[in-house]
Amino acid sequence: MGAQPGEPQNTCSRIQTLFRRVKTLLIKAPPPPQPPPPPPSWNPGCTHVYGYAFGHMHDNNLEHLPSQQVLDTGEQLMVPVEVLEVDNKEALWKFLLSGAMAGAVSRTGTAPLDRAKVYMQVYSSKTNFTNLLGGLQSMVQEGGFRSLWRGNGINVLKIAPEYAIKFSVFEQCKNYFCGIQGSPPFQERLLAGSLAVAISQTLINPMEVLKTRLTLRRTGQYKGLLDCARQILQREGTRALYRGYLPNMLGIIPYACTDLAVYEMLQCFWVKSGRDMGDPSGLVSLSSVTLSTTCGQMASYPLTLVRTRMQAQDTVEGSNPTMRGVLQRILAQQGWLGLYRGMTPTLLKVLPAGGISYVVYEAMKKTLGI
C-alpha cells in the first residue's frame, strides 16, 4: 500500500511535538542531586611545621583562630602563625614578648628536669648508672637545692635571639617563595621552617655550649656566664663554641620527618573519627603538637645525646672530641641503650613545659590586650 499524501508531514509534526514535550520535561525536572560533600578536613587551629605552629589553610589563606598558641617543649620553641601574620609593629612586639615570656616561665619551671637530663646524658654509664632520682639527689648534695637551676639563666637568655631569628628568617623565606601576600605551599613551608631552625641553631650554638658547661659546672668552677666563656676561649679556642654543631644539624632531619609524620597520622585519625572538624578544643591542638614533637625528639635523641657529650667533653675527658669518636665510645661502653640515656626526664618535662607555655602565652596576650 502507498503512503498517504499527508503522512510525512504528520510524522514530522509528531516528532517536533515529542521534542517539545521532552524539552518541557527537562526544564521542569528537578536539578540532579549534588555529589556528596568531601570528608571534613583537619582543622586543629594549628597546622604544625617543624619549629612553627601554623593556622589551618583555607583557600590558600591562613585563618586566625583562637586556639593558635606558642609551644615550648624545652627543646623547641614553636612560633605561632599569628606572630608571622602581624603587620602592626606594636602588636608584633606584644606577640613576641608574650612568646618569650611563655618560654622563660616554661623553661624555668622544668629546669630541674632539664639539668637531670644533661647530667644523665654525660655521667650515666653501665658502671656508674644514674637514674632520675639518683641524679637529682647527687646534684642537691653537691650544690644544694638551688643547684637544680644551674644553666637555666642562659637557657632563658637564648630564647629572645632564637625566637627573633626564627621569625625573621621565616618571613624572608616566605616572601621569597610566594611574595609578600599569600601562604607558601606545604613543601615550601617545611623548607622555610627547616632553614630558619638551622640558621637559628647555627647562630646560638655558642650559647648551647655555654649552657651545657654551666649546667654541669661544679660549685665554684665558674663565676658566671662571662667567666665560663673566657675560660673556654683561653683553654680550648673559639672552635670549642661550635662543638656539637654537626649532630645538631643532622638531628633536624629525623626530628622534622618524624614530627610531621606523626602529626599527619593524628590528622587522619581525627578525620576518620567523625567528630566535629570545625572547632576542636585547644586541648586537642596542644595534645597533637605535643605528641608529634615528643616523637620527633625521640627520633633525634641519639644525635642530641652525642651533641651534648661533645659540648661537655672538656668537662669529662679533656680531649678534642669528634662526632664519630663520641658515638663509637658510647656504643662500645654502653651499647645501643646508651644512646637514650636521659630519656626519662626528657619525656617527663614535655607535657608540663608545653602546658605552662600555652597558659602563660594566653595570659600574656590578655594582659597586653592582643
Curated annotation (Swiss-Prot):
It is a multi-pass membrane protein. It catalyses: Mg(2+)(out) + phosphate(in) + ATP(out) = Mg(2+)(in) + phosphate(out) + ATP(in); ADP(out) + phosphate(in) + H(+)(out) = ADP(in) + phosphate(out) + H(+)(in). SUPFAM superfamilies: Mitochondrial carrier (SSF103506). One of its GO terms (molecular function) is ADP transmembrane transporter activity. It is found in: Mitochondrion inner membrane. The lineage of its organism: Eukaryota, Metazoa, Chordata, Craniata, Vertebrata. Belongs to the mitochondrial carrier (TC 2.A.29) family. This is Mitochondrial carrier protein SCaMC-3L. GO terms for cellular component: mitochondrial inner membrane; mitochondrion. Solcar repeats lie at residues 90-176, 184-269, 280-367. The keyword Cell membrane does not apply. The gene is SLC25A41. It comes from Homo sapiens. The chain crosses the membrane at residues 96-113, 151-170, 194-207, 245-263, 282-306, 342-361. Keywords: Membrane, Mitochondrion, Mitochondrion inner membrane, Repeat, Transmembrane, Transmembrane helix, Transport. Calcium-independent ATP-Mg/Pi exchanger that catalyzes the electroneutral exchange of Mg-ATP or free ADP against an hydrogenphosphate and participates in the net transport of adenine nucleotides across the mitochondria inner membrane. One of its GO terms (biological process) is mitochondrial ADP transmembrane transport. InterPro entries: Mit_carrier, Mitochondrial_sb/sol_carrier, Mt_carrier_dom_sf. Its main location: mitochondrion. It comes from the Eukaryota.
